[in-house]
Amino acid sequence: MTGTDPAHRPGAAHLAGPVRPAPPDRPRRPAVLIGGAAGTGKSTLAAALAPRLGAALLDLDVATGPLTEVIARLTGRSDLSDPQLAALTRTPRYATLLALAADNLRAGRPVVLVAPFTAERTPRGWATVTARLAAAAPVLVWLRLAPDRLVARLQSRAATRDAGKISDPAKFLSTVDPEPPAVPHLALDAARPTADLVADVLAHLAHPGFAIDGKA
């Protein structure tokens, strides 16, 4: 993208790719996937958005974190962001998250998912998401934030899982992909107030193909 792209103007919300809601006669429950680097405020946005949608809130760290910590101890790793640990656990962690989402969707409940969604930013990864959430109309929300603000947020929240990132900010930032997803998505500036971000997502979902709170 060039510097003139509206997605890169402060305060801008940008929709990349075509909107593909379900046909009006077959409304689907929304499945909102909130992705972005650590520190962009994914969990904060999800916690504010889920009640507005009457949605189940599914967080990758909450759903799979305790088991990941056990595996880390068994394999002698203390850094949860260790690449070798990620290689062991990423596939089953995301499979668990998507399976929980699919169960809720089959029960008629919208879902809001929280995870970095790095592989899911690619056409191949997104195809896996849409296949597993076939009962839904998945929407990828990508939160972006300037590098210095990312580091400041991580230092402020001081979460155990961020210890490795905080100890070596330069190394952490080298792993952050600044490019937007290569699939249709809603790009949001994470520096904006949470209420404004929620409003942007709700506006994006205001299509006849989405069923929210039991209403088409």
Task: Please name every model-derived segment.
Residues 43:
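Walker A/P-loop
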Residues 40:
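ATP-binding Walker
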Residues 34:
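Hydrophobic anchor at the beta1->P-loop junction of P-loop NTPases
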Residues 133-154, 188:
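Conserved phosphate-donor/acceptor-positioning beta-strand/loop module used by diverse small-molecule
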Residues 47-102:
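Conserved substrate/cofactor phosphate-moiety recognition/catalytic segment
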Residues 88-134:
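Glycine-rich phosphate-binding loop used to anchor ATP phosphates in small-molecule kinases
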Residues 37:
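P-loop (Walker A) phosphate-binding loop of NTP-binding proteins
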Residues 156-200, 213-216:
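Small-molecule kinase domains that catalyze NTP-dependent phosphoryl transfer to phosphate-bearing small molecules
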